[in-house]
Structures are given as C-alpha cells and as structure tokens.
Amino acid sequence: MSTPYTWDIFCRVVDNFGDAAVCWRLARQLALEHGDRVRLWIDDVSPLERLNPEISAAREAQEVDTVAIRRWTGPLDAAMPAQVVVEAFGGGLPEPYVAAMAAAAQRPLWLVLEYLSAEAWVPAHHGRPSPPPRVALERYYFFPGFVEGTGGLLRERELFARRDRFDDAASAALWRTLGHEPPGPGSTTVSVFSYESAPLRELLECWSGGPAPTVVALPEGRALPLALDYFGAGDPAPGRVLRRGALEVRVVPFMPQALYDELLWACDINFVRGEDSFVRAQWAARPFVWQAYPQPEGAHVAKLEAFMQAYSTGLPSGPRDAVWDMSRIWNQIAAPGVTPASAWRALQASQGLLRQHGAAWAERLASLGDLAGNLRCFWRRKVKNG
C-alpha cells in the first residue's frame, strides 16, 4: 500500500443525495483502498444515513468504513488541518479552518472539487491555480471528466469484477432483497431515479400501452409521488406493485450504494439523475438516460448536450438519434416531432447496440484512471515539485 495521506473533505449538501453520495464515495475509497486517514465534514448527515445504514444522522461524530464523519455546524476552531483539503463543489471552508491552514508549518493543499461536466472548457481549467484572497495558500481547481486532461471519474478498484460476476442468480437474489420476485421472461426492466420535473407520467402511459411487459423499479424519493398520482395510489411502501396494462411499477426502498449498483446491472435500461447515479450508470455498461440537475437559465442544457455529443460519438445514426431524443424529452428540452412514446420505442429498439457501445465507453473512461487515484497523484506531484 502506498504512503497514507490525511484528507479533510468539506461538503455542503445542495442536491440532497448527489453531493453527499459523491463525497462519501470519495472519502470511503481514499480510506479503504489507499489506507488514507479521511475526515468528511458534512452539514447534513441525513443523506449519508440513507446511503449507508451504519451511519447515524443523530451523531455529531462517528467512524464508518474507517472514515471519520463530522457534522459541519460550528466554526471548527480546534480542527487540525489535513495535508489535503477538499472543498467540494465550491461550498467554501470555515474561516477559522482556513486561518489554521495558513498558520500550519506545512501548509495543506487546497483543492476545489468541481461538478462533473463534459464541456469543452473543462480540461483547460482542470488543475488551474486559484489563490484565495488574504491568505498565502495554494488552491487548485480539480475537475472530474471524460477525457485526458481531467480528473476522471470515481471508480472502485473491484467494480468491474463485481459487475462482471453479476449473473441471473444474483439478479434474482437482488429482486428478492428489494421485496419483489424476479421479472418474468420477455419483460423490459427499467430503473427510474429522477427529479420530480421529469415527464414520468408520459412514459408510464407509454409503457402501460406497450406491446410487451415493462417492469419499472422505482425507489422511494422525489419521483415516486408522480407514479402514485398516475395510478391513483396512496401507499408508497416498498414492496408494493402498481399495475396498469403492460406496465408494472415496483416500489423499492432507497438503497445503499452497493445495492444500487446491482439494480443498475439487473435492469435493461436505467434512468438516472444528478452526478453519482449518472456515473454509476456509465460503469454499469447498460443503456441509460440522464436527467441533469436543473439549473437557472438552462445552464444544465449545455452540460447535457456536451455529454451527449461525447457519448454518442461513433454510434450509428439510429441509436444516436434515439439516445439524443430520449435525453431531450427526459430533460424537457424541445425535440420537434418527437414524443415520449416515439423516443422510448426508438431507444428500446437500439438496446443491443447501445449495450455494446456502453461497454466500450466504460472501458475508455477507465483508461483515464479513477478520481481518487488521480487526486492522490496530483498531491504527490505538488509535494515532489515543492
């Protein structure tokens, strides 16, 4: 194992599970795979409790998977800075902590971990210095990304091996763990993890009137009320099954991260949102549709289109148009002449080619290294170069 480093990761929760999920995944990988000593400072612990049942939102301080989790509520006057300080998603750092960083005998490296984007400007800004005002500290932007010259994506060392071992028996066991029997033969299985702004009702209508069974796994969360309203149902309890026509919606519990990976592997097509589930869908090497986090003035549209441009490169025109059209529909972007039903039919017809493409895409992304390892390399270079 390489030399252990010390890390402080600061996270303000904005996108509920997205920000917390990325920071927890990073902290956990640094600690478990690299043996680093990691503190995760987070202002709202409750999302972590949903992601890992060993974590308690009631505790101010706890240690899980060798990560020290601290509720970030006070000024942190007594906190001794780590060697590397990660400011997640521009959430800032406590002023007394910054002062302690500046006063340290060996000043820490301050990294601003930015949101994931495929936009063309990202490589030029990755690793760029951004000296903070009023204090003599080194601060750099660190961008996850999909190309050389970026920080890559979070990926655990054994992820692909776990994915490739996941077979029909494991899939059946997963469904039973989630409170349901395995879907029958001939069904298209779909997972949906979306914001409430997604046009889910239109897709439910399409699936219910389809020529073959569609089984939808819908976790507890922001999209579930849309489905309950469609069915006129009031009970959102996990284990419930809602049926209409060819459609079967299975309510599943909000699940730990490792179990969610298995759900992605068990489904034919995955609808994902934000950042963490978006990345996991790509590692799953299955067809997927991404709902970008909605931003003011449509800033998320540029992010979506930049990613789609990169992801769809090399696809034949049919599958390329299918994934573009479904992505626009799902993000409520104008797609003239395209309906949710027509977009879905085209996407479903392209499953085979999209699955092959997804496997090749995942391998290409893996060649960039992983985000945790690339962060450590960045720190080593800075230490070596003084």
Regions found by a protein language model. Give the residues of each.
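A donor-sugar binding/catalytic signature common to diverse glycosyltransferases
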Residues: 24-28, 254-303
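Active-site and donor-binding regions of nucleotide-sugar-utilizing enzymes
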Residues: 11-136, 221
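C-terminal amphipathic helix plus adjacent low-complexity
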Residues: 313-386
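Extreme N-terminal starter segment of soluble prokaryotic enzymes
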Residues: 2-8
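Donor-nucleotide binding loops and adjacent catalytic segments primarily
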Residues: 182-261
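Short, glycine-rich nucleotide/cofactor-binding loops
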Residues: 9-20, 193-197, 269
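Hydrophobic/aromatic beta-strand patches that form the interior of the parallel beta-sheet core
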Residues: 39, 70, 86, 109-111, ...
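A nucleotide-sugar donor-handling region in carbohydrate enzymes
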Residues: 114-202
